[in-house]
Amino acid sequence: MSLSMIALMVSHENAEAFSLKGTVFDQVGQEANIDPVLLYSIALCESGFNPSSTKMVAPYPWVLRTPNKPIYAQTEKEARARLSAILKKSNAVDVGLMQINVRWHGHRIKNAEDLLDPLTNVRIGADILNENFARHPHDAIQAIGNYHSFQSDRVRSYGLTVWRVFSTLKAWHD
């Protein structure tokens, strides 16, 4: 699903009040001093999926994205098996809610399968985001954009898309 489609689906007309209390986004947000809605917004843009064919989209924990295609595993067990098969060929794979890239961030974990644990995945995503904010303390869009890419033509576009999703969700967050 494209980022523009996610931004469209998370419009004022479609958004309803929601709470992140008790979620991994709430827990990690408190631990990392990051707004949980921002973490959720990044996860929504990174792994957003609509498994039930409704108008709702949500971060999905068992997404694996290779350079060729995204894989939406139905279960954690399936995701583990698919990830193991992918890693036999390449470490160019993004994993889980926050789409942590094994090639660039594999050093942060003992085993790539650890990234299928939602809490671990969001914690690593928060660490990456905090590192970006430390590099760009006065430019949130740049810091958020660098979460996804360091290619200048993609950074601002991604950062602005996440910021629009964040701003919309923040207005509806309890």
How would you label these PLM feature ranges?
Residues 1-8:
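Bacterial N-terminal signal peptides
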Residues 10-12:
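N-terminal signal peptide c-region/cleavage motif recognized by signal peptidases
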Residues 14-174:
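Catalytic glycan-binding domains that act on GlcNAc-containing polysaccharides
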